[in-house]
Swiss-Prot record:
Pfam families: Muted (PF14942). PANTHER family: BIOGENESIS OF LYSOSOME-RELATED ORGANELLES COMPLEX 1 SUBUNIT 5. It comes from Drosophila melanogaster (Fruit fly). GO terms for cellular component: BLOC-1 complex; transport vesicle. Component of the biogenesis of lysosome-related organelles complex-1 (BLOC-1) composed of Blos1, Blos2, Blos3, Blos4, Dysb, Muted, Pldn and Snapin. InterPro entries: Bloc1s5 (IPR017243). This is Biogenesis of lysosome-related organelles complex 1 subunit 5. Belongs to the BLOC1S5 family. Component of the biogenesis of lysosome-related organelles complex-1 (BLOC-1) involved in pigment granule biogenesis.
Amino acid sequence: MKIMISQVGRELYKVPLRILDHRVFVNGEIEAFLENFEVRRNDSEVEKLFQVTETVGSLKYDLSRCSATGRGSGAENLAQLDTEVSHLLDGVNALLAKAKVERTASTQLQEARLAREQRRAEFLTNLEHGYRRIENSFEEKEEEIAELYSDLQLKLNIAK
C-alpha cells in the first residue's frame, strides 16, 4: 500500500513538469521562424548574387579569349566589351561586399526584444514560484499521508 502511495505521489510530482514543459514546442517555433525569415531569404539573395558573379566572370573570360583571337574592328568591339564587363564585375563585387555588412537592429526591434526578455523572466519567476508551491503542497500531503498511515497502523495494532 505504501509503495502504491509513493508511486502515485511521484506521478503527481511529474504532472506539472509534463504540463508546463513547452520548451520543445517553443524551440521548434523559433527555429521555423529563423528558417523562414532569415535563412531562406539570405540564402536565395546570396545565391543569386553568386550566380551573377559567375555569369559575369565567365563572360569576362570568354571575351578576353575572343579578343585575343579576334582581328580588325571586331577586336576593338571585343576590347570595349571586355572593359565594360570588367566594370560590371567590379560593381557586382562591390555589391557583394556591401551585402556582407552587418546591419544594426532598429531601436523598435531592440525595445521589443528587451520587452520579450522581461516577459520571459517574469514568466520563469512565476513558473518557479508555482513549482515551489506545488512541491511544498506535495511534501505537506506526503507528511499528512504518512501520519494518517501511522495512526491507522496504531489503531489497527499492525506491527511495522
